[in-house]
Structure formats: C-alpha cells, structure tokens
Amino acid sequence: MAEISRIQYEMEYTEGISQRMRVPEKLKVAPPNADLEQGFQEGVSNASVIMQVPERIVVAGNNEDIPFSRPADLDLIQSTPFKPLALKTPPRVLTLSERPLDFLDLERPAPTPQNEEIRAVGRLKRERSMSENAVRQNGQLVKTDSMYGISNIDAMIEGTSEDMTVVDAASLRRQIIKLNRRLQLLEEENKERAKREMVMYSITVAFWLLNSWLWFRR
C-alpha cells in the first residue's frame, strides 16, 4: 500500500512539474525600462535567429559602446612563429667514459684546442679512477676469497679435530674394554695357578711326611 501511494505521489509530482515549469522565451538582464523593453522587442527577431560566440567579451558601464582595439598580445601571439623544438632520443645505456654529461647540450660551441685538452684530461681522470676502482674491487675480492678460504680451512680443521676426538674416544673405549678382558683372563689364570700350586705343595708335604714316617718305622 505504501509503495502504491509513493508511486502515485511521484507521478503527480512529475506531472505538476511538467505543467507548471516552462523554458522562458527570453531572459531579461537589465532593469525594466520602456525604451529598453521596446528596443529589446524590436531586436528579438534578429537576435533570436542565430546565436554566435563573440570574439571577446567587453564590460562597459552606463550603456556606453566603447570602441576597443584588438589586443596587442593576441596579435603578438598570432604573428610570432613557433620555433621547432629539437628533441633527442635518450640512449639506452649511459656510459660516462663514452658519453660525458655534456651530451645534453643541444647547441655545442665550436671545439677549441683548450676545450679538447680539458676533455682529454677529464677523460683520463675518469679512466684512471675507473681502473683504480676496478683494482680496488679486485683486491677486495681477492682478500675476501683468501679470508673465505682461511675460514673454510679453519672450519675443516675444527671439523677434523672434532671427528678425531670422536674417533679417539671410540678407540680408547675399545682399548679399555680389551684391557678389562685381558685383566679378567689374567686374574682367572692366577687363581688357577694358585690352586695348582696349593695342590702340588700339599702333595709334596704329604709325600715327605709319609717318607719320614716310613723311615722312622724301620
């Protein structure tokens, strides 16, 4: 129900707007005046036929038609020819040794011997600095390689020493086990030898006692 009433209200609103609002036939800017109104009505037929965009807008007061000359700056702009701009395509790779920074100049002065000498000296300085930088970088690379090799050797020595300690501990443990076994065998042999000696000693003593008793019986 609310939707139907809303649609009806919108239809009535749009119908009222279309009936009451009209585009005016003319727009009045000046205050109401009989002379202006009459002149305006006389010139409406001519002014309403073709509408042209004026060349310039001139603001004048008190209904005065002040003659203005063509602006000087417009004549100057139209009379001044445009110079073509010289644009150069930037190179893909910027190399200071081959292309110095003065390649951006569009118009170079005539080369002089002094300028050539200055450029040659600057080029030599750049090449010397580049070679020194290359040698320095190579020296740093050699140093880093040597340091890396030394560190690798130290790491290998430490690793081998650790491995050696592990191997030594294992071998020592095996040797200790072997020594324990040999000591146990020696102890058992000593016990058996002591038993044999006791038996032999008792037999010898018994033999001598028997011989002495027999000798006394005779």
Swiss-Prot record:
This is Mitochondrial fission factor. Residues 1-198 are cytoplasmic. It is a single-pass type IV membrane protein. Homodimer. Interacts with DNM1L. Interacts with C11orf65/MFI; the interaction inhibits MFF interaction with DNM1L. The keyword Membrane applies. One of its GO terms (molecular function) is protein homodimerization activity. InterPro entries: Mff-like_dom, Mff/Tango-11. Keywords: Coiled coil, Cytoplasmic vesicle, Membrane, Mitochondrion, Mitochondrion outer membrane, Peroxisome, Phosphoprotein, Synapse, Transmembrane, Transmembrane helix. Its main location: mitochondrion. One of its GO terms (biological process) is protein targeting to mitochondrion.
